[in-house]
């Protein structure tokens, strides 16, 4: 019996525009590989509909590395997140599903990871950060949170100086990204003298 201690998030790697019925297509593809049925426990459609694949206690077929099929729930979002982002509805549904399953199975935040954490793939998409929970928090509150005047001023300065394009102002940055911003700011101040 599978008792999940991890949640692994995937994408179908098929653009929403190319196939609107990805649950059935994914199920058929997985069956063609001899897996019996869809390998994920859940699949989330663009409108936020959560579809059950395998039962939570059923062995998954989504992440073979480090026996993760035995130790995790596989949640897949429809879309190709190497070229597009999940819809807000998908983010809300994913966030709610993750929180519910974390409570149900005592899964730590650190154990909610993208597929690429275990496999040499881009999955859950190159356009998306590794920190799934922070990303979801920002995406689900983005429409309701207004930036303060000082924040808008700072963003405009960053855009005007070419340090950043100012997009996704509430998203965290890696140390390497911060170093690059500092380097650009240094060059801006040196050239301004």
Predicted regions mapped to residue ranges:
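Glycan-recognition patch characteristic of GH18 chitinases/ENGases
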Residues: 18-37, 43
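Short, flexible loop/turn motifs enriched in small residues
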Residues: 36, 68-70, 150
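Stable alpha-helical elements in mature extracytoplasmic
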Residues: 19-22, 26, 90-97, 150-154, ...
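Basic/polar, cationic surfaces and motifs that engage anionic cell-wall
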Residues: 1-16, 20, 46-71, 77-142
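Structured segments of extracytoplasmic/periplasmic soluble domains
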Residues: 26-33, 61, 97-104, 135, ...
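Short, solvent-exposed alpha-helical surface patches in non-cytosolic proteins
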Residues: 140-193
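Residue-level detector of short, conserved catalytic/binding motifs and their immediate flanks
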Residues: 5-7, 38-40, 73, 176
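Surface-exposed patches in mature extracellular/periplasmic domains of secreted proteins
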Residues: 34-41, 105-115, 167
